[in-house]
Design a protein with these regions (language model features):
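N-terminal membrane-anchoring alpha-helices
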Residues: 1-61
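Active-site phosphate/pyrophosphate- and oxyanion-stabilizing loops and adjacent acidic/basic residues
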Residues: 52, 86, 169-170
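Non-catalytic C-terminal accessory region of glycerolipid acyltransferases
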Residues: 4, 130-245
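A generic structural signal for alpha->beta connector loops
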Residues: 59-61, 94, 115, 144, ...
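Catalytic core of membrane glycerolipid acyltransferases/transacylases, capturing the structured
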Residues: 24-43, 55-57, 70-126
């Protein structure tokens, strides 16, 4: 019975979230045309609405640990579900993503992605994809802010192993900026696919930045170790206190 109730709550949450996305995006579009800063405000308002509505509709609270970045910086984050995107954007001053070019063709996501300076990249052979990404980043570097990349290249369910891709190291080397790792446990509550969401407290943690100057291999090894340990620690906190998850 509890499962059925939670599933119904999850369905209600999903429906109202996408309705809110449509309404907020529609009314926010005119001011977002005027200035990029207004587009950031609209996007952040939606993200904050999602976390607020999740807390009372499905009983899913959110927690931010660590110090979010304030200046220009590369952010490399663990990606478990849409929720970690929401949480990172809600606390990052000027976020812009490395994202699949197909997403920019979507009416709402595409419009706001272009307004805040997200960088579309076509997927293909690894060497070609990296060259395309670096070229796109250089073209988009006129838009200051925090460039966000998911070094595993996809959403990864808790416990699954997916290698870290060299693209993150190539960006780190090309930009010459600090890279802030971000760990999370959100996949325990909000999965990669499906409607069902679990109650609890989902956490992301902004970890100490990795300073520029490391070679690619050393950087990628340190990045993976830092993010995986941080995420495993966050997940262990939840699992140790809630065996049902």
């Amino acid at each position: 019975m509890l499962f059925i109730i939670q599933w119904i709550r999850s369905l209600i949450f999903a429906l109202q979230m996408y309705l809110a996305m449509t309404v907020i995006a529609f009314f926010g579009a005119p001011i977002s045309f005027l200035r990029t800063d207004y587009a950031y405000l609209v996007v952040r308002f939606f993200c904050n609405y999602v976390t607020w509505s999740a807390s009372w509709i499905i009983g899913l609270k959110t927690e931010i640990r660590g110090e979010p970045p304030s200046g220009e910086m590369l952010i490399a984050a663990k990606h478990q579900s849409f929720l970690d995107v929401i949480m990172i954007v809600s606390k990052t001053p000027k976020p812009k993503f490395i994202m699949k070019s197909s997403l920019t063709l979507m009416p709402i996501i595409g419009f706001y992605a272009r307004r805040i300076g997200c960088i579309p990249v076509k997927r293909g052979k690894r060497s070609e994809a990296i060259k395309t990404m670096l070229s796109a980043v250089q073209d988009g570097n006129a838009t200051p802010g925090q460039l966000i990349i998911y070094p595993q290249g996809t959403r990864v369910a808790p416990g699954d192993k997916v290698p870290y891709k060299v693209g993150a190291a190539a960006l780190y080397e090309a930009l010459g900026q600090p890279c802030m790792p971000v760990a999370c446990n959100v996949g325990l509550f909000w999965g990669r696919l499906g409607i069902f969401k679990k109650p609890g407290t989902a956490t992301i943690e902004f970890l100490p930045p990795i300073m520029p100057g490391l070679d690619r291999e050393t950087f990628l090894s340190k990045l993976e170790e830092t993010i995986e340990k941080g995420s495993n620690d966050l997940m262990a906190e939840v699992l140790d206190s809630n065996a049902q998850l």
